[in-house]
Amino acid sequence: MVNAIKRAIEVIIGVILQFGFQILIQLYFNNNIAIIGIIYDILSILIVLKLLKDSTSLSNDLPWIMLILVFPIFGTILLLTLGGSYAKNKLLKNIYNTENEYQKYLKQDNDITKQINDNYLDNLKYLNNYARFPASTNNDVKYYNFGQDFYPSLLKELKCAEKFIFMEYFIINNGIMLENILDILKEKASLGVDVRIIYDDMGSIAMLSTNYPKQLSTYGIKCIPFNKVSPFKGIFMNNRDHRKMTIIDGKVAFSGGVNISDEYININSKLGVWKDNGIKIEGDAVFNFTVMFCSLWNANIKEDEDLLKFKYDFSNKKCNNGYV
């Protein structure tokens, strides 16, 4: 609650300052309204050109462009105040570039394509073209109906980690679930295991303090907040990271709807029985999760890594439980 109030105050103050700055400009040039119009016309043209140049999705940017062109003063003020997604444009561009760079690790095995029934081949091609991840067949998949079923398996695999642990979640909240996980992560980090955490800054805004990554670094755990909330970079906090996954040694990946918070394992759930499921994957598809995580990590940190060092060799594993 304290974190939520503190972060809310920061954002509110930032918004007030931004609006105040715009008002002061207009009051200062009150007797020269023509000058203001010219300034905003020039600024709006520059902003539109910038949006067109950096756009990764014209359908998303077009409403802003139209608003600015039709109402230069109003549209420009609104974008500068509320357009937080454009202040994050550098991050989005880094993600886009990193994902493109990592396509070299995600080649579809043509032998698998030939095995798939023609009725499903179009679905595979669609997912491969748009999600840009290959299908694989050498996998074991286990489904968990509830978070409290998923959780013990996650803890067990974390305790077995020898090389790396990558965790990415929308919500990370203090409580029993996080405490038990952190105990394992601290121990593993002390033994030289590469432990990395990504959490969404908006999703965890009421739970974690702004210096949480620094706190974890004292234990040797690397941590970054995704798309950090800043009152001076707009309040339109779009582009959130809703992914929930853990990858361990390239051998096993966990995903699903379970965040790191007690209600997801039905401890102290104020809303009754909490229903979210999860899956555990062992096999070739784990590397897809590794690439997903590293794409976001290296878009933020910009580490030049060969991701093949995180790929586990499953050539001795023979399993055919469908396609992942």
Task: List each model region and its residues.
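N-terminal localization/anchoring segments of enzymes in phospholipid and broader phosphate metabolism
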Residues: M1-V324
